[in-house]
């Protein structure tokens, strides 16, 4: 028979796949030696075959690890695949080969470049080693330190390239101006230890501090504007820090959103998939092992914290007490720092010379408070019983508040001193102007013979009283002048030297940073190193175990150390404007801190008892750093805006405000129109709407962020639900594989018992859903779920109904239409509502019990007792097929009707027959209709007298109606032959069938005229009762049964399997599989009913008005809703 294009393509694919499989076996699994020649494999003149072989070899090389072969077979296969690709790929195109080679070369180069770049990442291997032994929480501290190191490198480059180097290269040299010259009274003590320690002497008059830089607007030949650069760089330090922090936080937020909030299969991933098989170094293997163990400990702790039960009343009370203690500690530290700063100011006013402790007591007290208070907070946090990660965050917040309180108390005290210095400077300026207006005295003397004489002069000393300033002349002979200068008139004008408050603030910030570094080194050596030595070497000689009890080995305190970095960076931001070299000093400090801390951790510290996983993004650290940056920027901005710059030092001397340098530069160095534009932009008319617009934009973006966060949570929940549904489906599949065998056994036992006790009296028409491919599911989803009741219009059966249901394929629910026969005397009857699963899962050999042996016995009350059985299908019905059962022992009553279109078995028109119900699948006229569930049938009578069904030419196989089941098992061969003759002779009188109800037949098909046959061409078969009491024309209903599971796919009762082409399969829907049996009176036997199944997008049936809009056809259509169908003459 002629096959279709799809069949040809399928066979071609199967043939190519088998050839490819044979080629794989011969190439990959063949045991050949090294003398393998690539010319013997894949050598062909066909370009398509060459391309297929090359493509296969590439796929093999890409998926060689997934092959279930030994390593030797994999290596041989990989070697041969490379040889074939290198040899034959050039036959197709050399450009593709060059591209592939270039891509491979670039991939190798990129990998080498990445490995080379890793070498330049500072302290990468050191951090990995720490992470493997101490966990990600401790490693996060060092990663954070490295990131701060990078920020300070950039800040150092900015200040050094634009401020420090131009001043050193093009500025005035040291000693040329008063701001760059050490006073004479300080020269002798400029190199003393206490002077250097207090950052005085030569350090004070150097590029380290603000006062050294000159006030010239342009320096050098290029006319570099140093004052403007100094101001812009100071603002750029804050701007760059803000931008970097926000970008890093946004990147970490995206990373944390991309990853799942809670990990699935945590322990499985860590146990089975955590090892890195590329490790070749024993030390790296040891570190990786420690890292895996530590991650498992972290996961175990996470699970334990989820299941921990707490007494909330006691916990709340302890937390309240802990917070009260923390507040008292914070208030006490702030008061102590402010008291020390105020005391130092009073000492400076009362004493001329201060001791070393009095000069540095402020920095020492601040460092002691910042070092001891976090330990007290750590002890207090033990009362709260939080999760370790939550405890860390509370500890970080408290220490942050402590550090901010210390810094602000220090800066407030410093600004108070700046106010007093400005008052003194204003008073000094007034006195200097008074001396400038006074007359100039001159003294003339004869030169003595000794060659020298004392020069008259005046020394002035300022003394502050309550309301006036008094100048007292103490002496007039202050120095000895050589006689060569004796006869000159020397004018004298001298006032008190002004002080530079910007340099003083920079000195205090740098001094605080230096002392903090020293205290950090001392705490590491004392608390960690010497403590570890004491515990290790004296534990054997002590009264108790020093390793498990006090003092034991030190633990790395993450919160304290992280906040120490934040505090240190805050000092840098606060003092960078007054000390341009402070970021460079911080770079050196961070380098030393990295090496010292890492050494102490690996040598002296032990892992924390409660190891916990650090946050994925570390945004909490960055948020604290951002908060610190904002609060440290405020004092600097306040000083720039509020205080007047010093008169005798700095690049802004002579200005009313520091920011006036910008307006002065715009006025003098830019065109007039630019100055006008800047003036309009800086006016309140523009600034206020811009600020409002920014607030609106921030609110809009925040709303979008909230909505995106909510949507991401919903999507994550959907993913989790999908995973749970997949798990349920897998469980159902496992149960479905286990159920059929048990169901078959139970069904066979039930059927055997029923056959022994009683004969079945129930004719059932079962409707089973069919689960098809995904494309078919999309089409089936459009088929509505219809439910109707057919009321029998015969006089004794009004009100009785047959229910049949057509459900969508997504619901595994079936409706069984049953008709119960009356019980014979002395026989039991089966339950008419018996479950469908028992019958559908029975073996094909046991189908004799499913169909009645005597369908026509005692049929006078056949129409009674109808019921509907609703059964839920619990397993997928992928192998369900509806086929007509074979019928035996009946002959055609007339020769086949010969026609061009239809040839069926039929009877004379005058004989009464039962009404037929055609279940028609209604489709639109513009859609292409498919064939019905079964193709149009053609019958003939073979030589043996059996009915043979002929399929059309496009059907690949025939199905012969061979004897399957005897109508009456009590008949012998002679009686069967007699039955055949009686059926042919038309020996049944019509009057004997008056009380016999006819069986209603349900047919499936499309509305199209060429697919639905006329009722008069339908097959008619005569039956005779078992006891020969009557004979009649009856239509046995078509049964839908489950396809048996067999390896060869053949039914045991059929000689040939009915194979229909795949293009007929899409027409198999729920509505097409309906077949049922019903009864009617002989008065209504000449009318056939059509049940239309409408295909629509909705879930509910169409109304009668919608059905009436369809085009009327040549047959009779029920115009009402399916729930009101009446089986009567319409």
UniProtKB/Swiss-Prot annotation:
Q: How does it sit in the membrane?
A: Multi-pass membrane protein
Write the record's keywords in alphabetical order, separated by commas.
Glycoprotein, Membrane, Transmembrane, Transmembrane helix
Which regions of this chain are Cytoplasmic-facing, per the record's topological domains? 1-148, 214-225, 341-361, 415-509, 592-619, 702-1130
Q: Which InterPro entries match?
A: TMC, TMC_dom
Skewed-composition ranges (Polar residues): 747-767, 856-876, 1097-1106
Provide the primary localization: membrane
Tissue specificity here reads: Detected in most neuronal organs and also in some non-neuronal tissues.
Any idea where this protein resides? Membrane
- Transmembrane helix among keywords: yes
Q: Which residues lie on this side of the membrane: Extracellular?
A: 170-192, 247-319, 383-393, 531-570, 641-680
Classify the source by domain of life: Eukaryota
Entry-listed glycosylation sites: 264
Its transmembrane ranges are 149-169, 193-213, 226-246, 320-340, 362-382, 394-414, 510-530, 571-591, 620-640, 681-701
Q: What does this protein do?
A: Probable component of an ion channel. Molecular function hasn't been characterized yet.
| Entry's family note | Belongs to the TMC family.
* Official protein name in the record: Transmembrane channel-like protein 3
Give the species. Mus musculus
